[in-house]
From Swiss-Prot:
This is Isoleucine--tRNA ligase. Monomer. It catalyses: tRNA(Ile) + L-isoleucine + ATP = L-isoleucyl-tRNA(Ile) + AMP + diphosphate. It comes from Mycoplasmopsis synoviae (strain 53) (Mycoplasma synoviae). GO terms for biological process: isoleucyl-tRNA aminoacylation. GO terms for molecular function: aminoacyl-tRNA deacylase activity; ATP binding; isoleucine-tRNA ligase activity; tRNA binding; zinc ion binding. Binds 1 zinc ion per subunit.
Amino acid sequence: MSLDFKKTLNMPSTKFDMKANLVEKEPLFRKKWLEDDIYQKVLKNNANNERFVVHDGPPYANGDIHVGHALNKILKDIIVRYKSLQGYYSPFVPGWDTHGLPIEHKMLTESKLDRDQITVELLRKKSRNYALKQIEHQKKQFQKLQLFSDFSKIYITLDKSYEAKQLKVFKKLALDGLVYKGLKPIYWSPSSQSALAEAEVEYETVTTNSIYVSFDVTKSTFNKVPVGSKLVVWTTTPWTLIANAAVAISFDITYLTVKYQDSLYVVAKNLFYNDLLEKFQWENYEVVDEFLGKEMPRNSIWYKAPLLDFDAPVIATNYVLEDSGTGLVHSAPLFGEDDFSLTFDNDLKLIMHISDTGHIENSQTKYDSLFYEEANKEIIKDLAEKVVHVYTYSHSYPHDWRTKKPIIYRATPQWFVSIDKVRSKIVSELQNKVKTFPEWSKNRMISMIENRGDWTISRQRTWGVPIIIFYDENEKPVINEEIFDHVIDLVANHGTDIWFSSTVDELLPEKYRNRNWTKENDIMDVWFDSGVSSIAVDIDGGKTTLPFDVYLEGNDQFRGWFNSSVINAVAYAGVSPYINLVSHGFALDGQGKKMSKSRNNVVDPLDVIKKYGADILRLWVANSEYSSDVHISESILVQNSEIYRKIRNTVKFLLGNLNNFKYDKDLKLTSIHHYINEELKSVKKEVLENYDKFRFINVIKVLNRYVIDLSSFYFSVTKDILYIRKENDEERQMVLKNFYEILDFLMLALAPIIPTTADEMYSYFNKENKKESLFLERLEKAGDVSFDEKVLEQFKEFFELRDQVNILIENQIQNKVIKRSNELELVLPETASEFLKSLDLKTLLMVSKISYGKTLQVVKFESEKCKRCWNHFASLNKEYEICDLCFSVLKDTLANA
């Protein structure tokens, strides 16, 4: 009789395709999630549970999203999906930052007009419309990342409700005495014609002409520096010499008076011997005198200002260092913080000779109308007789992060938030209430707060939230709660445009009108806009308030959004806005280089999605050590595609075998199947703990290792049980129970990272009480998972034996004694443990016979091969040439054949 034995096997069967086709499937799943309202259903299901909210730092509403955006949003989405699966109430409200110079500048460029040629109202209208269009553009791009949000609720910093809440924060800070107007040097961008905050400054290496120039002493009552001596200073900004008003020395530095070519020069001793002698190339010099800075009496030395006709003092301070220069510092009070500090106790001249555009004006010199950089050359030329040395100097110099042009320190009247009054409270919140990942970043954040100066919040621009301050008839700022509230109500109803389109009296409460008051024209720093988001964003009708569970942004935000947010939140509400502060690095190319169009190394996330699908991009994010800079390239994406393929192949195998399986939670597992189940729990706990620590790379490592181990052992040794035995065989049911629980866990564990694939897997999963989507299921919490360590420990003995046996088998195959392990007989030492003897080693080690002898060895088994299971036996059923097991399985079939 002829029987096709292959048709009698329980072969895997599933319609789950090995080919992912993510590019085609992802839009379909996105559509399904939206139509089925999955996100809202999850929120509703979890509404009364413990909350865990990731607060979105708003990207700027301008241009296409880049790979840095993708990295950031995917990291957040992994957390939101994970916590939602665990039953937490985790609404995610995406935000956009919409004010500021880039949009304003773009509108001016498109209009082909200067600021003074376009009305404020028109410029703001154009800026608003552009920002709203950009939000819609970016929203569509973000949706392609398969984010767990339906984008029905977003926050935008130009919304009038947001602006009104922002002004409430400003009001409280002003009433609490934290806001003040003052003259002090701040970062000024001539290219933007505006003040900048620290977070708006980036540094580039530049090469400039640096000079050592001497100032002639005109008066002296300090005999160690006689009249006629020359004070040598070093500067990289010759244009500031016009505003020179003092020379600063240190109390604690030792100075020399050195005679060279009939002139006396004053320099710091250590710098003279260690640096200046070589630079100046002086020979035949003579040290005439030596003194400590503190020995110089106050107001004892005066010198002629280098470019203007007045005498200026030498002042001893505690901020001058001996690490570079000459130990004597040229001080222009309106162009440097330390320089400005000299004005507090000294009656110094305050000279402002630089216009908003960076041109010299009202300087009483011939340099008027020159741009400050152009003036440098002329000044060096004109001071030739006083210049001791000139050289080119490469150094890091601040630039405007938007225009990429150099900036300067320049004192102008600005509005500030005082940090000193809230500094200790902020530091306390960071130290005691905030967890950071990576851990070292807490010290970085604390250090920034401890060392930062007051926050310049005013900007001399048009597109932004106004500083709602009025000035009385004496030009003094009016800080009045009633007036603040009145204006804030106007903004809540009409938006901030009303500040610019209305007269002063139209903005004031009636009783304050007709007083000849004026209003402030400056707008707020955009970091103040985004920095109030923890207070201004309405997540769910006011139920969710700060502190939020997670802030997650690039590590450039330590001086940006992380900084402005904690200042505003502590000043307004007395608490940190975040509980967990997570930072990531920048996305670089495969060689670790910054991406740029000029290098032709830009990786566009939308191109990656078009080629590989968003799940591969998301897998790359999860599989990156994001706490540092991350690399992305074609080869790296291919590597992640391989991991994805292994996972998909594993799931296909599981689904195929689980076809028609009915899960029985009460089925007791024994032997290796019990071990596999305990191992699953161990892996589950490890994965969940790494999710909780935001260590997604470890999640991927653990899961990847797990599926490889499953394929190499459990899947291999159970194939005969699955394929050969009767469908309802008890041990076969044990294997399938494990498969079911393994697959159930894998889908849920992978869902935060590769949501489309995970939900696709779920759609093929045979499960009672199945939900519309995997994301309506529940994932356990790490604390609820336990496993029997004794079982895992006990089986170590078996796996040590397996490693030894595999080496012996491999030798037999390489020596061409056998082709497959099931052609061998395994001889175990008679001293083998009772535990090993209790196991079905024939199945677990995939050999044909187990016997016992003096030593561990494998020998070729003289046998016959079963035509159905292909295993080897001493003898077979003569009629059908099959083994006893196969015969028992087919008994009824053969009888009826």
